[in-house]
Swiss-Prot record:
Disulfide bridge positions per record: 43-302, 54-226, 80-113, 178-188, 208-247, 242-271, 363-370
Signal peptide annotation: 1-19
Residues with glycosylation annotation: 56, 177, 338
Membrane topology reported for the UniProt record: Single-pass type I membrane protein
Keywords: Disulfide bond, Glycoprotein, Lipoprotein, Membrane, Palmitate, Signal, Transmembrane, Transmembrane helix, Viral envelope protein, Virion
Ranges in the topological domain labelled Intravirion: 481-524
Pfam families in the cross-refs: PH_Rhabdo_glycop, Rhabdo_glycop_CD, Rhabdo_glycop_FD
Other facts noted in the record for this chain: Its mutation dramatically attenuates the virus.
Function: Attaches the virus to host cellular receptor, inducing endocytosis of the virion by using different host proteins including TFRC, GRM2 and ITGB1. In the endosome, the acidic pH induces conformational changes in the glycoprotein trimer, which trigger fusion between virus and cell membrane. There is convincing in vitro evidence that the muscular form of the nicotinic acetylcholine receptor (nAChR), the neuronal cell adhesion molecule (NCAM), and the p75 neurotrophin receptor (p75NTR) bind glycoprotein and thereby facilitate rabies virus entry into cells.
Full protein name: Glycoprotein
Length: 524
């Protein structure tokens, strides 16, 4: 089922709803005319089964669309993206640490995504912790890589469920739809290779809560079911119905576009793919209740007209118009030909627009062709006017002409990032603005000694370092020798000055050089 079919449901509903609430009814099959007496006239009961003699009514339960059912069934889901966050640190020779964060992707498994989603919904504190980047570790002259595998959950991500084939439709899916959710496969691929979509509830059937049980009266003839009177009192015929599954539930699509699930013994053909069903909303229920009241009122008007005919013993074309069948189905048609009251078996169909039965001037279309008139008289009070136009004495009340107003969803789903084609990631580093990480799985890898240089540079640096170290040792040894040498010389000279005595020329002993010097200066 193409996704566009759901978008055109509101457009298809209006003509189908006219089938349920016709502005007029006219025979599509008209039997031979036969004269009758005035006492054979009778008013049709549009609320009582007159379908092929099925007059046996019995109570039964059936399933119909829930009131408020809308064309697009919303399925809440979430997307799960596998993200690997890598923190790479390098500590150089002087202890300066540089940290680089990188992101990569991996395709997650559905089980892991389901567990991550449950973490988020349960408010597990580990979820808050997992939102942070991995804590980078570091070692001197080494490169340390710390990685964390995270499952990124973004919710809600709302998809539309097609009730006809249970396929899902959303712009986050590559082709706009997903038909792969089964018991064994519980996810859909998305526009992102490393992101999958999953429903919040693993049982997708629970999202299709569109049915309700109702009570009505089954109309049957022997073992054959002809139709039923619904919970609101309106008869619905099974003639022309076809089998149609909604959300996997087998039911019948009736000619008026409604859908019911009920037990029947008759063999029914499957509906063609283009057969859709009417929406069931509060407005349709309200109008259906008003239709029942209107049909009761019309029956009272018919009985009043019939009583007038019986009392006055006279029949007019205007009075015969009250005896027309007001809903699709089997009934009678009446007319007056050459002052003779005539009756014919008829099967009535609904009229959507007046152009269907009056396509041109003077033509009353019945059974696909212009019906002949007798001296300007057709049937059911329809005549040919003096100007050649077909005149229909009455039409259904304005109540039955109003258009059906469909309920619109009051829930506006949040736009998921993947629904915008511009957010389809081409590079791994574009995921930073997209992700919220979950379920950390931290791994640490410590490399060997790394100086941050190529291989030849490492050897040059080691050689230079060794040479500098040798030169430093030699320099220190040289400095130590120079510091020790002046101290030893001074100590030896001091000792000599104290012990050596000098004899002067006069024969006196001079104890030191200073005394000798002072003595010499005295002599001078």
């Amino acid at each position: 089922m193409v996704p566009q079919a759901l978008l055109f449901v509101p457009l298809l509903v209006f003509p189908l709803c006219f089938g349920k609430f016709p502005i007029y009814t006219i025979p599509d099959k008209l039997g031979p005319w036969s004269p009758i007496d005035i006492h054979h006239l009778r008013c049709p009961n549009n609320l009582v089964v007159e379908d092929e003699g099925c007059t046996n009514l019995s109570g039964f339960s059936y399933m119909e669309l829930k009131v408020g059912y809308i064309s697009a069934i919303k399925v809440n889901g979430f997307t799960c993206t596998g993200v690997v966050t890598e923190a790479e640190t390098y500590t150089n020779f002087v202890g300066y640490v540089t940290t680089t964060f990188k992101r990569k992707h991996f395709r997650p498994t559905p089980d892991a995504c389901r567990a991550a989603y449950n973490w988020k919904m349960a408010g597990d504190p580990r979820y808050e912790e997992s939102l942070h980047n991995p804590y980078p570790d570091y070692h001197w002259l080494r490169t340390v890589k710390t990685t964390k595998e995270s499952l990124v959950i973004i919710s809600p991500s709302v998809a539309d469920l097609d009730p006809y084939d249970k396929s899902l439709h959303s712009r986050v899916f590559p082709s706009g739809n997903c038909s792969g959710i089964t018991v064994s496969s519980t996810y859909c691929s998305t526009n992102h290779d490393y992101t999958i979509w999953m429903p919040e509830n693993p049982r997708l059937e629970t999202s299709c809560d569109i049915f309700t049980n109702s009570r009505g009266k089954r109309a049957s003839k022997g073992s054959k079911t002809c139709g039923f009177v619904d919970e609101r009192g309106l008869y619905k015929s099974l003639k022309g119905a076809c089998k149609l599954k909604l959300c996997g539930v087998l039911g019948l699509r009736l000619m008026d576009g409604t859908w019911v699930a009920m037990q029947t013994s008759d063999e029914t053909k499957w509906c063609p793919p283009d057969q859709l069903v009417n929406l069931h909303d509060f407005r349709s229920d309200e109008i259906e209740h008003l239709v029942v009241e209107e049909l009761v009122k019309k029956r009272e008007e018919c009985l009043d007209a019939l009583e007038s005919i019986m009392t006055t013993k006279s029949v007019s074309l205007r009075r015969l118009s009250h005896l027309r069948k007001l809903v699709p189905g089997f009934g009678k048609a009446y007319t007056i030909f050459n002052k003779t009251l005539m009756e014919a078996e008829a099967h009535y169909k609904s009229v959507q627009t007046w152009n269907e039965i009056i396509p041109s001037k003077g033509c009353l279309r019945v059974g696909g062709r212009c019906h002949p008139h007798v001296n300007g008289v057709f049937f059911n009070g329809i005549i040919l006017g003096p100007d050649g136009h077909v005149l229909i004495p009455e039409m259904q009340s304005s109540l039955l002409q109003q258009h059906m107003e469909l309920l619109e969803s009051s829930v506006i789903p949040l736009m998921h990032p993947l629904a915008d084609p511009s957010t389809v990631f081409k590079d791994g580093d574009e995921a930073e603005d997209f992700v919220e990480v979950h379920l950390p799985d931290v791994h640490k890898q410590v490399s060997g000694v790394d100086l941050g240089l190529p291989n030849w540079g490492k050897y040059v640096l080691l050689s230079a370092g060794t040479l500098i170290a040798l030169m430093l040792i030699i320099f220190l040894m040289t400095c130590c020798r120079r510091v020790n040498r002046p101290k030893s010389t001074e100590r030896s000279l001091g000792e000599t000055g104290r012990k050596v005595s000098v004899t002067s020329q006069s024969g006196k002993v001079i104890s030191s050089w200073e005394s000798y010097k002072s003595g010499g200066e005295t002599r001078r």
